[in-house]
């Protein structure tokens, strides 16, 4: 992921932004560097990749495409990272030229340091040669970023036929030797540029498996050896690297880039996931043995330490906050821009705010919740580490648990209360609705879960007359009828009784047919308790309605 420091740093000059427009967009921008008229304020490169035109100033931190992973935005991020490193080096060099030394300060190193800075300044384009193996080192923690750079210069020194007993180093040797080394390095880069283009394109979307063996075995380095004659140079494959690096012990703390780290970071922009910097300051670590043409080339820790202090001090003094810090961006900087959601308890979730709110909106639509529950969805999604599947699962579990609890409370409270009231003619809510809704009756609104109310006495509890059959036939129509005979809720006992009446109609019709067939036979008298407010009829309704459900 491109770090926030890299993209938000104001380290790009006008010419760099123009180059970025020309290279990323694939054509000339609206304002060219050669035009006489003053150039317009730059627009956001990421928004321009998606067809928008928004002024860059004040917009960078709020751009909706900050974490976009499309091809254009990845190229833009790599180019901006390289430009930031170049600008940091230029500022450090300008400060070294203008700043007067104070007490307890030492001047920069001999002209070899200037040569090294200028090499890092203009080697950005041809430095793709070693991007493939530097990329592999970045993918495993970012601590091996200087390995490819050091190995390349060692190969250049070997090709220059340096004496085996006195090899030339970056800063320890004379300025003439350093200049010849860098000159050969440039020639080597130019010679290999065409061959490296295809390799860079192949490695642009994939991170290669790289076996880093004996990681912490070469802390005690041996004097390095170089062959007297070497006719062919080749970039070592991934399996040839066995480098190890000790823990970073640079005194800069903030991770000011060393010269070799900056070069490795600069050269790694050829891959789409190329990192923006090496590990922390590498003053305590030495590169392990790398193999070139079957010959062991091992760098000592003391040899590599000489390249660190001066560039680190100059960068630390000039670009403490504006320049990107390789130690803070190593490892993660080489990954493609992605929405990482693996943070604990939602802390620092690098999701865009619009994406996060869009997830909350999807949860609302899935569970059909009102808009007022948006803050609740936000809290649930944040607690679930911005994982919408996990948040949905938690909400579903909570809903099932609440439904189970409501059903348990109803059975423990309302059903015994209905039985104690002594009204067997009323059907309890679960008995009625379970046949219609199955086991999901608790999804109905809670307003329907309430104890039954008493029925008015005038509807069905008229005293029975001794006339027998006429009393029975006259009592039945006295109960209110319903057009469809459905039950609306347990809160309306009238509808419940209506369903009981309609369900018992076939029984009454059978009785009437039997009476019409034998008119001389009197009907059997009702039981003795039938005169007590019509309880016989209510009991009959209860049995028939239960059977009907």
UniProtKB/Swiss-Prot annotation:
User: Where do the record's region annotations for Disordered lie?
Assistant: 1-42, 129-331, 452-549
GO terms under cellular component:
nucleus
Domain of life of the organism encoding this protein: Eukaryota
State where composition is biased (Gly residues).
Answer: 271-292
Q: Does the keyword Zinc apply?
A: yes
Q: Where is the composition biased (Basic residues)?
A: 129-152, 205-223
Q: What is the effect of changing residue 47 to A/H?
A: Abolishes DNA-binding
- Where is this protein primarily located? nucleus
Q: What does changing residue 91 to Q do?
A: Abolishes DNA-binding
**Entry's Gene Ontology BP terms:** axon midline choice point recognition; courtship behavior; female analia development; female sex differentiation; female somatic sex determination; genital disc development; imaginal disc-derived female genitalia development; imaginal disc-derived male genitalia development
User: How the protein is affected by changing residue 59 to Y?
Assistant: Abolishes DNA-binding
> Which Pfam families does the entry link to?
DM, DSX_dimer
* GO MF annotation: an example: RNA polymerase II cis-regulatory region sequence-specific DNA binding
Task: From the Swiss-Prot or TrEMBL record, state where the protein is found.
Answer: Nucleus
- Record's keyword terms, sorted: Differentiation, DNA-binding, Metal-binding, Nucleus, Sexual differentiation, Transcription, Transcription regulation, Zinc
Q: Read off the InterPro entries from this record.
A: DM_DNA-bd, DM_DNA-bd_sf, DMRT, DSX_dimer
Function of the protein: Controls somatic sexual differentiation. Binds directly and specifically to the FBE (fat body enhancer) of the yolk protein 1 and 2 genes (Yp1 and Yp2). This enhancer is sufficient to direct the female-specific transcription characteristic of the Yp genes in adult fat bodies. Involved in regulation of male-specific expression of takeout in brain-associated fat body.
**Protein name as catalogued:** Protein doublesex
- Source species: Drosophila melanogaster
Q: Which gene encodes it?
A: dsx
